[in-house]
């Protein structure tokens, strides 16, 4: 009977253990005016270890990803997660205004989720519900206004 109870006690541990080891992280890139996803955007992620920690040998600490049709890029953290994580997306600066880089503590990302810097926008054009779930980084880009597009060639240098 005791052996049966031991095995029965191990079942929840085996069931809950694997999701804790390889935590999935999703990076979403959206249009701040309407909430639509930005597709085919380059996303770069750096895993930053503290105090001499190193990523596993079979895991690259510098990832290069691309958003899919839903505006998402996904990856899994290694079994020994980094203390911090840096993520940035490269958008066309002639069309988009974006604070598209974040440096976050991995613990905060897994527990709460992170919303990147939101570019300033006119209140009537902003997309209100900007929230990130646990394990999610949300980066918001805003299309340039007509005036910003007209002035862009003069200020880009």
Model-derived regions: residue spans:
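Sec-dependent signal peptide recognition
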Residues: 2-10
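A short, amphipathic beta-strand motif
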Residues: 25-32
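Short, ordered, surface-exposed loop/turn motifs in non-cytosolic proteins
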Residues: 33-51
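Short aromatic-acidic-glycine turn motif
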Residues: 47-56, 98
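Short, acidic Ser/Thr/Gly-rich low-complexity loop/linker segments typical of extracellular
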Residues: 53-76
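Short Pro-Gly-centered beta-turn/loop motif in secreted/extracellular proteins
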Residues: 74-86
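Feature of secretome-associated and extracellular-like proteins
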Residues: 86-157
């Amino acid at each position: 009977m005791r052996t049966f109870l031991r095995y029965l006690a191990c079942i929840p541990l085996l069931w809950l253990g694997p999701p804790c080891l390889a935590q999935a992280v999703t990076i979403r890139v959206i249009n701040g005016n309407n909430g639509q996803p930005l597709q085919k955007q380059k996303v770069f992620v750096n895993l930053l270890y503290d105090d001499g920690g190193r990523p596993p040998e079979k895991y690259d600490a510098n990832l290069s990803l691309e958003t899919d049709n839903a505006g998402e890029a996904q990856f899994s953290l290694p079994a020994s997660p980094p203390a911090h994580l840096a993520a940035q997306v490269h958008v066309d600066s002639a069309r988009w205004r974006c604070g598209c880089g974040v440096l976050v503590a991995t613990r905060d990302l897994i527990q709460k989720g992170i919303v990147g810097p939101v570019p300033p926008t006119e209140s009537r054009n902003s997309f209100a519900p900007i929230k990130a779930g646990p394990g999610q980084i949300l980066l918001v880009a805003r299309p340039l206004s007509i005036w910003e597009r007209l002035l862009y060639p003069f200020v880009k240098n």
